Amino acid sequence: MLIMKKLLLIAATSATMLSSSVSFAEGMDHEWYLRIDTGAAMFNEEKDKATGVKLKSNTTVPVALGIGYYISENFRADLTLGTIIGGKLKKSGAATNAPFTRTNISASHKPTITRLLINGYVDLTNFDMFDVFAGAGVGSALVKEKITYNGITGLSSNTKNRTNISYKLTLGTSAQIADGVKVELAYSWIDDGRTKSKNVIYQGTSVPTGGMHYQSHNLTAGIRFDI
C-alpha cells in the first residue's frame, strides 16, 4: 500500500511537470504521442559486500512505455514507466572478506527495478532522413534484490523495496517511417541508486548484504506514434 501511494505521488508530480510544459506551448499546433522502447542493457560491475567477490552483469532487457508531447519543432517531453527483465549481477570465485576468506562461492544479485521518469529531448541536428537528439530524465525508482549464494549456507536473503531518485542521460537518432510514426535508436545511461543494506547473522557474526548500486548502459530501439 505504501509503495502504491509513493508511485501515485510520483505520477501526480510528474504529470504536473508535464502539464506545465504543455501549458507553456498552449495555442500551438503540436501533438501528443505514445512510445514503447526495448533493447539490451548491462549493469556496472559491483562488489558483493559479504564476500568481496566482484560481480559482473549478464545482459538484461529494459522495457518502457510512455506518453509524450511535442513542445516545439525540436523539443519534446515524455513520461515513461519502465522495468527490466532478467537482469543479474553474478560471479563465482574465492571470497576475500572474513569470515569467508578463500572459500569458493558463487554469488548472485537479481534486482527488481521499476522506474517512473519525466524526460526532455532536444534535436541537435536535422537531416533529410533522420534527426540526432540528446535527452535527460529524472524521476523515481523502486529497487529491491534477491541475493543467493552457493558454497555458503544460510546467507541468502531478499531486500525490501527502496525508493531512489533515478537519473537518465540519452543520445540517439530518430527517423520517420510513416505519417505520425517515428523510430528511434538510442544509448542511455541510467542510475537507479542502491538497494537497502541488510545484516544477516552467520555463525554468530553479523554479515552485511545488499546495498548494490544499480547503474546501467542501455541500447534501445523505440517507436513513437502520434495521437
UniProtKB/Swiss-Prot annotation:
The keyword Hydrolase does not apply. Keywords: Signal. InterPro entries: OMP/PagP_b-brl, OMP_b-brl. It comes from the Bacteria. Gene3D superfamilies: 2.40.160.20. Residues 1-25 form the signal peptide. To R.conorii RC1281. This is Uncharacterized protein RC1282.
